[in-house]
């Protein structure tokens, strides 16, 4: 009876080892990229159209809430991340600079940054923007800015 169980047990042991090696991340180099966590944060290209739309909205809200005489706009997107929820959350870390355009001017995209040292101002801001594109809804959930 011991001999009749030997072969099936050996095959079972080989199967267990093969499965362990197949699913273990430490079992050697993986050739495929790990699947993303559903609802997890992912880095995104700051130049994507939807990221730029979220950035423009965050800039607009920043300027509305600022007591500064001048508009500010993004100098650099340091990091852009996205999370798919019941819409899309964007987490943007942005270096913002003061422009030469006063708040009475409307075309912010063409405003140059101040080059006079006493008028230059840079802020490092973290924005959390929530967008529901199919409802045409966007809101700024969090904004935290520090002098850079």
From Swiss-Prot:
Signal peptide limits: 1-28
Site (described: Reactive site): 39
Highest taxon listed in the record's lineage: Eukaryota
Gene Ontology MF, one: cysteine-type endopeptidase inhibitor activity
Annotated localization: Secreted
Swiss-Prot/TrEMBL keywords: Disulfide bond, Protease inhibitor, Secreted, Signal, Thiol protease inhibitor
Cystine connections: 101-111, 125-145
Motif (Secondary area of contact): 83-87
Coiled-coil annotated spans: none
Gene3D superfamilies, sorted: 3.10.450.10
One annotated Gene Ontology cellular component of this protein: vesicle
Pfam families: Cystatin
Functional summary from the UniProt entry: This is a thiol proteinase inhibitor.
Similarity comment text for this entry: Belongs to the cystatin family.
Entry-linked PANTHER family: CYSTATIN
Protein name stated in the entry: Cystatin-C
Organism: Oryctolagus cuniculus (Rabbit)
Top-level taxonomy: Eukaryota, Metazoa, Chordata, Craniata, Vertebrata
């Amino acid at each position: 009876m011991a001999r009749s169980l030997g072969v099936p047990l050996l095959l079972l042991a080989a199967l267990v080892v093969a499965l362990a090696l197949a699913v273990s991340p430490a079992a050697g180099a993986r050739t495929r990229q790990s699947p993303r966590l559903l609802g997890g944060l992912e880095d995104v290209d700051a130049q994507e159209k939807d990221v730029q739309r979220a950035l423009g909205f965050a800039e607009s809200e920043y300027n509305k809430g600022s007591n500064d005489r001048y508009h500010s706009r993004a100098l650099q997107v340091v990091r852009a991340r996205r999370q798919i929820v019941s819409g899309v959350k964007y987490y943007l870390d942005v270096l913002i600079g003061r422009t030469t355009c006063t708040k009475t001017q409307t075309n912010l995209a063409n405003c140059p940054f101040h080059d006079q040292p006493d008028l230059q101002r840079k802020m490092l801001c973290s924005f959390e923007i929530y967008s529901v594109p199919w409802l045409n809804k966007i809101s700024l959930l969090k904004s935290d800015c520090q002098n850079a």
